[in-house]
């Protein structure tokens, strides 16, 4: 057993493996993750301006889990100033190298977990009670929801907006799409298995929480009606699970959970294979998986050849090393107004 002076290392999904990486890693991360469309952020802005009170609605936004600030920068089109927070100091340090200098002038970066934001060292003018919109980009499954939501309420002004979104695996379209999607799933599931064990480790509660949130399409995330109102849940391409790999990638069982308030919340499901559509070749698939599962190649060791063989199958099914195919994604967006 670990001693009190030498506690067990807690490995969490993505976060632990991403620590210590510099500008090159984060540049590749930005390039190889999906790129949310301008219309997606316009939808968030439209909700924001049509709910809550109208005072100072476009002054301050805060991007939680900002990484190197690429999504935070997109918010500058809609807000005067954007705060970006993250637990990863190296990710924050990469922002000036990856973003335009004129954007950096209108941004503030803060090292903090989401759960600790209420006590973080955020300048008063852009901190507690001053924030018009909080955007939680792709990190919500990792968070302690009750603690994080309490921190978000502390930052938001009354009538401010909380926007949470999450995307998962690529969905291949067109000819032989079933074959392509099955091959992707086999690859991603084997990659996830290289990271085992999860169960019985200090980080297991976070692994379980993340798996539950993803397998539930974020329906496991509740909004307290005493604290939030006008909750809307958008679900694009919900016919595909909001997970990066199948359940066989885990060493524990997880089932979907629905904690929605069906009497007050609105859920909108949209099937649209052109949503966030991009053209991907085999290299882009491999780079995407590198960004989702950092360091998996080292964890795989000699077994990496199993994945290489599957990549070869997928490359052939795509039509060759340079052949591309349109992909879309399952995406969930949660919107709520602070009471």
From Swiss-Prot:
It comes from the Eukaryota. It is an enzyme of class 2 (transferase). InterPro entries: Diverse_substrate_MTase, Methyltransf_12, SAM-dependent_MTases_sf. Pathway: Secondary metabolite biosynthesis. One of its GO terms (biological process) is methylation. Its EC number is 2.1.1.-. Methyltransferase; part of the gene cluster that mediates the biosynthesis of pestheic acid, a diphenyl ether which is a biosynthetic precursor of the unique chloropupukeananes. The biosynthesis initiates from condensation of acetate and malonate units catalyzed by the non-reducing PKS ptaA. As the ptaA protein is TE/CLC domain-deficient, hydrolysis and Claisen cyclization of the polyketide could be catalyzed by ptaB containing a beta-lactamase domain. Belongs to the methyltransferase superfamily. PANTHER family: METHYLTRANSF_11 DOMAIN-CONTAINING PROTEIN (PTHR44942), METHYLTRANSFERASE TYPE 11 DOMAIN-CONTAINING PROTEIN (PTHR44942:SF4). This is Methyltransferase ptaI. It comes from Pestalotiopsis fici (strain W106-1 / CGMCC3.15140). The gene is ptaI.
